[in-house]
């Protein structure tokens, strides 16, 4: 008896509420899986509706439309002959569920709702869905009339179920379930499940892929099994970027791994695997003893085999391969826009340089995809790069058509170095660059106060107060935002772009500066989207250093050393951010932790550490209001202060230096200093 089977998983660039577009991508993935000889296909979480519908999941239309799309899949005879695992939202007994639908030859076999919902970080699934808090429970689901007529039955099973096929056994788990301590695959494997499917909507953040791969390896390394992981790719309408990287593992070893970042709308990953490898892996007596004690699952018998019925097909198992990881500096990318292009205000500093380099990196990916014949990308390029009927041959040529940079300086205050760095970078990447002085705008705005009140503000060096000095600086900063949007609206017309259009304004404030509030409200940090708003300065420096060598851009070396000082280092800011968000430490707890990390002989004193901790929290508290209007940032760092839904905090805080936490820090510092004077060690 043959034990070789070909399986398929996929990454789909789905879009929330793009019903027909999502359906077409699902259909394409199934057809590609069939062409590759696969007999099982699994896809991303909620792929029919798109994962990022957010509060639209509270609308009844979403569930009706999802059933409409499911009906189209069931009635498409070209999709027969393969077992299909597809994700959609469903309504059952008045409750909303995030569910999988298992389909074979136009018939809905069962529905498998998600057991454990993601409800931390960026996720709020409990807001939309009900968890299936009945492990191993199965009941009947009433189908809508349209599906009843097609199925010939009124109900189908719904629940935590195992499918028993003619030659193997399989079961599904969904995204977050893999991350739980007692994941469903543990008892499923002990119940004889040999194939696990996992449909995910897992967004990218730096270094997150390493965690995913480790969890999937662990899922099958001890208990054996074949694991199919599917994930969404691209942006589906929110600030999250889904990074694909679908994969297939056998007994903890990767046999197939898709791209982590791809411009493909549909990427199908297939592998041929040997069921006997799983069975041989499970021969240990200790596993058998636990299997006999494991709680039993209901099984649905499916008259279908995944192995090929003919011996004329020559197959060999797909060999194992090592995992493929991107360096953090390689993971920083930009994806999807429906406007006429981009505009970035270049300051000559590393942040706007990083944003520009990310766009240039995107242009390299796009041009390579064009050369590879990617039809979807070619269609997008023809629409966006409208200045020429000819497809771009180089990234610089494409960059010049879609990317606009602008340096907005002051005649006497802007340095020649920053102006030259901006100009050199624009020339290297090929952007359409504008260099101008904004003195007239600055003086016109400054004089409005004098005209209205008779008061003439002065910079501090000319005898003015701190208030005057800050107000005059902010005129420059905020004028740049207005001018950037003005240019973004008018440049396509100035350049006589066919079809006109306007540009997407990109911001350039990094996560560390957002955390401290080291930015001006409504300056150039205010934009349509901020590609680096959740990336640390340390990672940006590494990215620029990497791009300097790997993208042949030595000009970038000049930017690495052009970094401002905020009274604390960026490495310190990164550590503050990590302890605050990931370790859930307040001011006092953070101080105690840093005593061990930064204190000791020859290192920082307790008072120096206390001053740094208090200074950070003081600025974080007084500037928190800036995050309420921060430009939407692509989520990349797990300590992001994104106020939208990732980091929910007040924006009005009582004075930090009068807080109880700071008083406790002071008490501890005094106790430590007294002990050190006595030559004692305080633990």
Task: Describe the residue ranges of each PLM region.
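Enzyme catalytic cores with a strong preference for nitrogen-chemistry domains
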Residues: 1-345, 356-383, 682-683
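ATP/NTP-dependent adenylation/nucleotidyl-transfer catalytic domains that generate, transfer
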Residues: 6, 22, 166, 224-225, ...
């Amino acid at each position: 008896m043959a034990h070789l089977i070909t399986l398929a998983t996929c990454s789909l660039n789905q879009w929330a509420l793009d019903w027909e577009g999502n359906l077409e991508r699902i259909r394409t993935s199934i057809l590609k899986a069939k062409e590759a000889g696969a007999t099982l296909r699994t896809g991303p979480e909620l792929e029919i509706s798109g994962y990022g519908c957010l509060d639209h999941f509270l609308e009844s239309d979403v569930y009706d439309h999802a059933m409409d799309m499911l009906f189209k899949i069931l009635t498409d005879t070209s999709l027969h002959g393969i077992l299909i695992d597809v994700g959609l939202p469903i309504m059952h007994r008045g409750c909303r569920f995030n569910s999988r639908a298992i389909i074979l030859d136009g018939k809905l076999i069962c529905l498998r709702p998600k057991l454990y919902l993601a409800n931390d970080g960026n996720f709020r699934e409990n807001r939309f869905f009900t968890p299936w808090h009945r492990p191993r429970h199965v009941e009947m689901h009433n189908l809508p009339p349209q599906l009843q007529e097609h199925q010939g039955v009124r109900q189908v099973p719904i629940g935590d179920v195992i499918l028993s096929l003619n030659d193997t056994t399989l079961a599904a788990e969904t995204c977050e379930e893999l991350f739980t301590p007692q994941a469903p695959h543990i008892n499923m494997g002990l119940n004889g499940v040999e194939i696990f499917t996992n449909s995910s909507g897992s967004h990218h953040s730096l270094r997150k892929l390493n965690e995913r791969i480790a969890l999937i390896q662990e899922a099958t390394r001890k208990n054996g099994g074949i694991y199919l992981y599917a994930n969404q790719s691209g942006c589906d309408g929110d600030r999250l970027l889904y990074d694909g990287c679908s994969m297939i593992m056998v007994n903890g070893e990767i046999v197939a791994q898709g791209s982590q970042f791809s411009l493909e709308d549909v990427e199908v990953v297939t592998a041929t695997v040997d069921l006997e490898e799983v069975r041989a892996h499970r021969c240990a007596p200790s596993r058998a003893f636990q299997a006999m004690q494991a709680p039993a699952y209901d099984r649905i018998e499916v008259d279908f085999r995944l192995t090929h019925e003919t011996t004329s097909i020559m197959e060999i198992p797909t060999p194992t391969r090592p995992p493929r990881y991107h360096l953090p500096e390689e993971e920083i990318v930009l994806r999807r826009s429906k406007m006429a292009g981009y505009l970035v205000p270049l300051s000559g500093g590393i942040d706007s340089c990083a944003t520009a380099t990310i766009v240039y990196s995107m242009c390299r990916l796009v041009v390579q995809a064009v050369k590879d014949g990617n039809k979807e990308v070619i269609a997008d390029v023809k629409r966006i790069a409208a200045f020429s009927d000819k497809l771009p041959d180089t990234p610089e040529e494409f960059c010049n058509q879609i990317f606009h940079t602008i340096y907005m300086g002051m005649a006497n205050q802007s340095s020649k170095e920053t102006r030259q760095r901006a100009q050199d970078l624009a020339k290297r990447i090929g952007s359409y660059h504008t260099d101008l002085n904004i003195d007239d705008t600055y003086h016109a705005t400054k004089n409005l106060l004098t005209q209205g009140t008779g008061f003439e503000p002065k910079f501090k060096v000319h005898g003015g107060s701190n208030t005057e000095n800050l107000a005059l600086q902010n005129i420059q900063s905020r004028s740049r935002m207005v001018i950037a949007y003005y240019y973004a609206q008018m440049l396509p017309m100035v350049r006589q772009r066919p079809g006109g259009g306007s540009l997407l304004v990109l911001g350039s404030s990094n996560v560390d500066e957002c955390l401290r509030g080291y930015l001006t409200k409504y300056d150039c940090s205010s934009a349509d989207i901020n590609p680096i708003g959740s990336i640390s300065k340390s990672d940006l420096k590494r990215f620029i250093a990497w791009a300097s060598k790997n993208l042949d851009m030595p000009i970038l070396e000049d930017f690495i050393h052009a970094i401002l000082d905020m009274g604390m280092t960026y490495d310190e800011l990164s550590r503050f951010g990590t302890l605050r968000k990931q370790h859930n430490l307040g001011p006092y707890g953070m101080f105690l932790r840093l005593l061990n990390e930064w204190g000791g002989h020859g290192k920082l004193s307790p008072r120096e550490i206390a001053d740094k901790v208090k200074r950070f929290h003081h600025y974080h508290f007084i500037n928190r209001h800036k995050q309420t209007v921060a430009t939407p940032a692509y989520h990349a760092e797990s300590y992001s202060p994104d106020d939208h839904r990732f980091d929910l905090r007040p924006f009005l805080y009582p004075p930090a230096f009068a807080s109880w936490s700071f008083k406790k820090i002071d008490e501890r510092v005094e106790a430590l200093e007294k002990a050190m004077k006595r030559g004692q060690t305080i633990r």
